[in-house]
Amino acid sequence: MAAAASMLRGERVTLRPWTDADLAPFAALNADPEVMLRMSKPLTHAESDAFAARIRSHIAEHGFGLWALEVPGLGFAGFVGLSATVPFELPVPGIVAAPHEIGWRLARSAWGQGYATEGAKLALRYGFEVAKLPQIVSFAAADYLASHAVMRRIGLTLRGEFDHPRLPPDHRSYRHVLYAKDAA
């Protein structure tokens, strides 16, 4: 296990451990149809709380995870961070077995201001420099251009496309793109 990061600070954002005070705004974020448009579905409050519990458990076990994103003036604005492994096979050449994923989900009030990019750069640096990960991947729905732009801005490159195995073929987000970066 890599050393646990208590906080990662950028110029405008902080990635920090979760607190119980984050649960209500996290539930609101996960219930927002705009935020969840490309996910399987909006989450109920109970589903959101269960997801937050899994995130906290992951951080406790691995020393990293999907940290709470704190923005001055907004407070809790979502999450940015790393998952230990992608829980399904990615059928794209050049991807290591059980790769680590970088991801983010932000409240609409935090969209379009560079917070995801700034937070993702902090998480990516932690993943390579502290956790010593060999490769970090990120994927999103093929039509989710804002997420693709963040992936490119943090230095990931397009590696291929795949059909998401956890979504039905008629789901708007069934087709995904995969970006990745290898350790230097």
Question: Where is each model-derived feature located?
Answer:
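Acyl-donor (CoA/ACP) binding surface of acyl/acetyltransferases
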Residues: M1-R38, E70-A184
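Conserved GNAT-fold acetyl-CoA-binding loop/helix
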Residues: E34-I55, F64-W67
